[in-house]
From Swiss-Prot:
Gene3D superfamilies: GroEL, GroEL-like equatorial domain, TCP-1-like chaperonin intermediate domain
Function: Together with its co-chaperonin GroES, plays an essential role in assisting protein folding. The GroEL-GroES system forms a nano-cage that allows encapsulation of the non-native substrate proteins and provides a physical environment optimized to promote and accelerate protein folding.
Gene Ontology terms describing biological process: protein refolding
UniProt keywords, alphabetically: ATP-binding, Chaperone, Cytoplasm, Isomerase, Nucleotide-binding
Entry similarity comment: Belongs to the chaperonin (HSP60) family.
Catalyzed reactions: ATP + H2O + a folded polypeptide = ADP + phosphate + an unfolded polypeptide
Name the UniProt record assigns to this protein: Chaperonin GroEL
Transmembrane parts of this sequence: none
Amino acid sequence: MAKELKFSEDARSKMLAGVDQLANTVKTTLGPKGRNVVLEKAYGSPEITNDGVTIAKAIELEDHFENMGAKLVSEVASKTNDIAGDGTTTATVLAQAIIREGMKNVTAGANPVGIRRGIELATREAVKKLHEISHKVESKDAIAQVAAVSSANEETGRLIADAMEKVGNDGVITVEESKGIDTELSVVEGMQFDRGYLSQYMVTDNDKMEADLDNPYILITDKKISNIQDVLPLLQSIVQEGKALLIIADDVDGEALPTLVLNKIRGTFNVVAVKAPGFGDRRKEQLEDIATLTGATVITSDLGLELKETTIDQLGTAGKVTVTKDDTTIVEGAGSKSAIAERVENIKKQIAETTSDFDREKLQERLAKLAGGVAVIKVGAATETELKEQKYRIEDALNATRAAVEEGYVAGGGTALIDVIESVAALEEEGDVQTGINIVLRALEEPVRQIATNAGLEGSVIVEKVKSQPVEVGYNAANGNWENMIEAGILDPTKVTRSALQNAASVAALMLTTEAVVADKPEDNPAPAAGMDPSAMGGMM
């Protein structure tokens, strides 16, 4: 296919137009008075959301060059979401501000390489200062406040704080759709390990790219499955029962994997294969843990067991299994409570006896997975559209809370970014490097400016007033008061704020140093030739 090229100012202006279209759509959702965005769906009713990354992913522009600019900023939102789980709108706002100011200066003749260096220096200083003013999460109230700010709902904040209290800060918390209209919390016995599906064609939910199995059989083995004939008798028995299957094995490759995928795609039966967690002797122990939880027998040569001879009664079962590209979560395993209790006691004895800190840490992880369980937040709403929107909010709040536990929290509402301006302004460089620093200084004001704009106020006036306030005092757009944001419970996780700034600066710096853009040239499809009019034949037979 032929390519179309644009250079220098032409290329950058087109990409900036794409950046603006995406960012202007996303930034309307920022803050407690942010608006919603309605997304058209190919099937079913439109989706209403205020989730930055969901909106960014949905935007495709007709112009190839503009679309590339939009996609680069969408990448900022996605990366921030992957690292911190929240802060995608803030990241988009920061990226747009840095790119726009940078483009102005590059167009005026500044050296983009010098500007990039200045952006990197300023970002590093801002991140350092964010860590200095960060507070550790030391109470259930702080957890509830972080979650409440992210979800814009105090009840959600309390729910997430309760969930973390029950399963621990590192425990497994999942968000599911409820059949009723109330949102509630329940804790079920379950386990999560860090192995995802071996093929993306095994997913059942294409939007979230995860596989959900209800009441599946679970085959656990330390063997490699390469030949489908090894498990064919077992698969035939499972197909007859019409149940799903989770395979946990050393590996599934050769002809076995494509055969399983083909049967999944054809709808013969629902199957997901994952690699066994851990390595060496630790892997054997973890497989035994999973087997105890699910009531399975580990198919291993150590016990003289072969895959060809495996029967259904050697398989485990569970109420639900969810597999993502990175993790597998088993909920409501059918193992006997006495066997699980015995296994837990055995691990506790090993913890007491071990002299290695590393071994103790790994044993405690296993204990938490066996004994801690999984907290499930069941989201309820009156309509399906509201349900999806609520679920997005709770998932964001949960991610934000985990981020706060990890790196602490800072004053919310964009106040922390203004609080670091003084430190960044103290940097003194020359020429275009200083220009890059000044660009970041201006961008740090942008989240507060946008929150104020969304609340119907003049953003620049609010920014100047926040600058004149003591550290951590800012504008609460929810009630219109000026107050200490920490004391008012308006908190942002440090990790979220840091990731948003770092990712925005990274992509912005790359765009500013772009000198050429290559895109596919649109094909000119000529109109098909019109059919000949029979009457033009003059009645010829």
